[in-house]
């Protein structure tokens, strides 16, 4: 077996999965937890479990998938093969940017961290109404709009016809004019180059188009000899003899839009449409010679916000909005086609963007905040977008008002008479109350009038009138007298009477109402479903997406090469034959295998709460699994909920009830990074296991085992570099090892720091020491070397500076000052300041501190 083939085999599967512990004995560095879990296996019973600890991939497409990278259109396989050198597994990259969407559905450009190549024996093929076709791995998430209006990431294997796939409504490509691009559009639409003798012909019935082609030819190719003739059958033709023009067209592929065409894509599309565009009864149709060209034209049209449909080799533009945009942005040179197309704007229906609206969620927001916007049940997407804007304006006002009311109602209105006694002289003067009368109030021998109570409270800094006014506003706008009355244990008319009366007898009850209303405000402001609804409305108004209905979902079996681009943070990018938005747990599995043996899969359900956070997951998936009895003689089933701290408060409450309901035959294992985010009623029902970061020696032992098994040479320097970066995280350590192995079978510290996008710690320390010793310019030079040559971000450098500052040979007070400065400048970077300027300013601070 050759080295090249052997290396491909080594890297064809993520090692973090390949070397995942299968049994409890395989788990490294958590002996205190393994011991307790083994006891559960031995006894055959266990309580609900909560795994808490610090945070520890595969989403792939086929190689023929189109992707826009650095402003150009590539095939994904071609791009990854070029960047990875054909290697399987992850390959770190720098300077590669792709288009994706942010949390509000707006198009943005994102950095790619690494490219990935792998094999699979199973794919999901997806077709849509507009002619899109995607082939992705079964677990690849796609952004989908479901029948009930939900918008969420769904794994490909769970998609079904009728779901709506997110596609960008436009692509921010260069859309300018260019005479060469226009000439190429004409040539590729109606031109022909003879195999020899430098002859090019151009055939078109329209004399104006032939004239334009000849003008462009004369302008672009000075050596051209041009003549026009009419054949005996009446066919008009332009003959061009030009070595330069002939060489150009023979150097490009005629099945794709050439690079020169993309540089002036508006000009190219107009010329191509003049030649190959036709007007049908309800659409403009652009004919092509092959599917690849049709796909590229669809991408090009998307850059103008024109959503096209593919039908074989035809690109179809339909709907008034699309046709009008096409005519405004691209158009036809010929008046006859232009007039025909303009008639379609009046004939065709207004385009619907196809989004199913989540009326239930919108209604919840309206009811929760008592919004006054008129409801329209049969909303089109466009009307829903307008409604969301109206709602958002009202919501911002209401939330702002609720915060103001909360601030006012946070202050008690009961007077502390001991405090009045201390300030009696001031009260007598400002409240204008006689001394003997005030003394009786302080002793409780008589009560002040309500007016006097208000004046006394003012002296103590209590604004009773403002608080009562806030209570009235909340009761009328956000609650009801009936709701407050139920909580108070009285009738609603009593609440109204109390709030509007002016007797001091009601002050104690007013204080109770204040507390009730404050509690209700806090419930509203912390309502998870309300926040979800507001986020949905923001998305509805701001998103730059169109929704294409899925018509077919089919499973494919075979041996497939697949590719991925890893985009940290947002985990999605624009790809597909037409632009589409595509995306980017150990102890529980080991315990399930030990408990259930071969039947573990039948008795084990795994869910990721960060993907499936809503209350419906608890009500549907969990309950459906929990209702059935365990298989194979097991006494209970296991439901493993990863990233449980991502569940909403409502979902956690539903989970608590489900845990109680099915406690006889189901045990829950909840895994989270922060147990504090799990509600107390759930924590009290679980045995809690706190996973600690692994010791370096435990990680080192596992890495040496993997390296030996994979035929790698793991140097001591390389091992120490991995341990330094991993910081007790085994998953991170294994991923770094695999990424470094993609570069070389010898794992050195140089390769490790390269793939992990980290600077050497000694380089960071040297830079800081240079600054502290007063050598600012050399420190600045070292900083620029780290940033520019090693390609690190400013935040990466700051994180390492913070880690290394405590290892510097300086006095402790200076370390405190430096750590404080690093924190300050990190905040500046997070706020969006220029990283080079801020880091150089930080080094200047180091220099000043070093002189003290």
Curated annotation (Swiss-Prot):
GO cellular component: DNA replication factor C complex
Gene Ontology molecular-function annotations: ATP binding; ATP hydrolysis activity; DNA binding; DNA clamp loader activity; endonuclease activity
Gene Ontology BP terms: DNA repair; DNA-templated DNA replication; intein-mediated protein splicing
UniProt entry tagged with the keyword Oxidoreductase: no
Pfam families: AAA, Intein_splicing, LAGLIDADG_3, Rep_fac_C
Cysteine disulfide partners in this protein: none
Outcome of substituting residue 835 to A: Decreases the stability of the PCNA-RFC complex and reduces the clamp-loading activity
UniProt keyword list: ATP-binding, Autocatalytic cleavage, DNA replication, Nucleotide-binding, Protein splicing
Residue ranges occupied by any DOD-type homing endonuclease domain in the UniProt entry: 183-306
InterPro entries, per the entry: ATPase_AAA_core (IPR003959), DNA_pol3_clamp-load_cplx_C (IPR008921), DNA_Rep/Repair_Clamp_Loader (IPR050238), Hint_dom_C (IPR003586), Hint_dom_N (IPR003587), Hint_dom_sf (IPR036844), Homing_endonucl (IPR027434), INTEIN (IPR006142)
Impact reported for residue 795 to A: Decreases the stability of the PCNA-RFC complex and reduces the clamp-loading activity
Record's keyword annotation contains Thylakoid: no
PTM: This protein undergoes a protein self splicing that involves a post-translational excision of the intervening region (intein) followed by peptide ligation.
Protein function: Part of the RFC clamp loader complex which loads the PCNA sliding clamp onto DNA. The complex possesses DNA-dependent ATPase activity which is further stimulated by PCNA.
Note: The intein interrupts the potential ATP-binding site.
Family membership noted in the UniProt record: Belongs to the activator 1 small subunits family. RfcS subfamily.
Protein name: Replication factor C small subunit
Species of origin: Pyrococcus furiosus (strain ATCC 43587 / DSM 3638 / JCM 8422 / Vc1)
């Amino acid at each position: 077996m050759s080295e090249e083939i052997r290396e491909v085999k080594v890297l064809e599967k993520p090692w973090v999965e390949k070397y995942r512990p299968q049994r409890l004995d395989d788990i490294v560095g958590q002996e205190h937890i393994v011991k307790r879990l083994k006891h559960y296996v031995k006894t055959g019973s266990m309580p609900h479990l909560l795994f808490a600890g610090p945070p520890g991939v595969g989403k792939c497409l086929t190689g023929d998938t189109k992707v826009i990278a650095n402003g150009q259109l590539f095939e994904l396989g071609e791009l990854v093969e070029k960047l990875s050198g054909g290697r399987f597994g992850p390959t770190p990259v720098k300077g590669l940017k792709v288009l994706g969407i942010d949390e509000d559905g707006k198009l943005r450009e994102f950095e790619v961290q690494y490219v990935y190549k792998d094999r699979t024996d199973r794919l999901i093929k997806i077709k849509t109404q507009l002619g899109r076709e995607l082939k992705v791995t079964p677990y690849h998430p796609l952004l989908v709009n479901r029948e009930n209006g939900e918008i969420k990431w769904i794994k490909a294997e769970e998609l079904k016809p009728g779901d709506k796939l997110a596609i960008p409504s436009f692509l921010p490509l260069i859309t300018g004019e260019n005479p060469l691009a226009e000439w190429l559009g004409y040539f590729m639409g109606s031109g022909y180059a003879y195999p020899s003798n430098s002859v090019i012909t151009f055939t078109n019935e329209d004399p104006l188009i032939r004239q334009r082609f000849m003008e462009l030819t004369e302008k672009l190719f000075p050596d051209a000899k041009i003549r026009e003739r009419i054949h005996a059958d009446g066919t008009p033709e332009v003959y061009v003899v030009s070595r330069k023009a002939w060489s150009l067209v023979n150097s490009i592929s005629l099945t794709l839009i050439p690079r020169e065409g993309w540089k002036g894509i508006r000009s190219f599309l107009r010329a191509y449409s003049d030649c190959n565009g036709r007007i049908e009864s309800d659409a403009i149709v652009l004919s092509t010679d092959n599917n690849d060209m049709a796909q590229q034209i669809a991408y090009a049209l998307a850059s103008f916000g024109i959503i096209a449909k593919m039908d074989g080799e035809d690109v179809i533009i339909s709907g008034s909005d699309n046709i009008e945009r096409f005519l405004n942005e691209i158009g036809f040179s010929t008046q006859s086609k232009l007039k025909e197309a303009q008639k379609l704007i009046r004939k065709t229906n207004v385009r619907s963007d196809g989004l199913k609206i989540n009326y239930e969620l919108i209604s919840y927001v309206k009811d929760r905040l008592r919004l006054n916007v008129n409801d329209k049940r049969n909303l089109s997407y466009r009307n829903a977008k307008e409604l969301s804007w109206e709602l958002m304006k009202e919501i911002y006002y209401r939330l702002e008002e609720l915060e103001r009311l909360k601030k006012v109602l946070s202050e008690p209105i009961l007077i502390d008479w001991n405090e009045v006694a201390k300030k009696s002289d001031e009260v007598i003067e400002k409240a204008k109350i006689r001394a003997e009368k005030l003394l009786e109030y302080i002793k409780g021998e008589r009560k002040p009038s309500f007016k006097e109570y208000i004046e006394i409270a003012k002296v103590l800094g209590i604004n009773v009138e403002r608080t009562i006014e806030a209570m009235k506003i909340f009761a009328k706008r956000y609650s009801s007298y009936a709701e407050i009355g139920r909580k108070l244990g009285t009738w609603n008319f009593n609440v109204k009477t109390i709030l509007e009366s002016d007797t001091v007898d009601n002050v104690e009850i007013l204080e109770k109402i204040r507390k009730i209303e404050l509690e209700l405000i806090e419930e509203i402001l912390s309502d998870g479903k309300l926040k979800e609804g507001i986020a949905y409305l923001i998305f509805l108004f701001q998103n730059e997406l169109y929704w294409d209905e899925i018509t077919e979902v089919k499973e494919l079996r075979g041996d497939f090469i697949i590719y991925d681009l890893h985009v940290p943070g947002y985990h999605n990018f624009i790809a597909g034959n037409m632009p589409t938005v595509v995306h980017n747990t150990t102890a529980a599995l080991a315990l399930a295998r030990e408990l259930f043996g071969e039947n573990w899969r039948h008795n084990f359900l795994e869910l990721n709460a960060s993907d499936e956070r809503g209350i419906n997951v608890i009500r549907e998936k969990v309950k459906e699994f929990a209702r059935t009895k365990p298989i194979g003689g097991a006494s209970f089933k296991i439901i493993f909920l990863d990233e449980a701290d991502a569940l909403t408060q409502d979902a956690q409450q539903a989970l608590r009830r489900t845990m109680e309901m099915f406690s006889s035959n189901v045990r829950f294992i909840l895994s989270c990074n922060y147990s504090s985010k799990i509600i107390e009623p759930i924590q009290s029902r679980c045995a809690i296991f706190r996973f600690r970061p692994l010791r370096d020696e435990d990680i080192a032992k596992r890495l040496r085992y993997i390296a030996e098994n994979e035929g790698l040479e793991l140097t001591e320097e390389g091992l120490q570099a991995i341990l330094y970066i991993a910081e007790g995280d085994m998953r991170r350590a294994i991923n770094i090892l695999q990424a470094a192995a993609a570069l070389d079978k010898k794992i050195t510290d140089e390769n490790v720091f390269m793939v992990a996008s980290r600077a050497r710690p000694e380089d960071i320390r040297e830079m800081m020491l240079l600054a502290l010793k007063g050598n600012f310019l050399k420190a600045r030079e070292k900083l620029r070397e780290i940033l520019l040559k090693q390609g690190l971000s400013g935040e990466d450098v700051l994180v390492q500076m913070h880690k290394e500052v405590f290892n510097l040979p300086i006095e402790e007070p200076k370390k405190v000052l430096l750590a404080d400065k690093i924190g300050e400048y990190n905040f500046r970077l997070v706020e969006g300041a220029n990283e080079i300027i801020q880091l150089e300013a930080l080094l200047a601070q180091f220099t000043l501190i070093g002189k003290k």
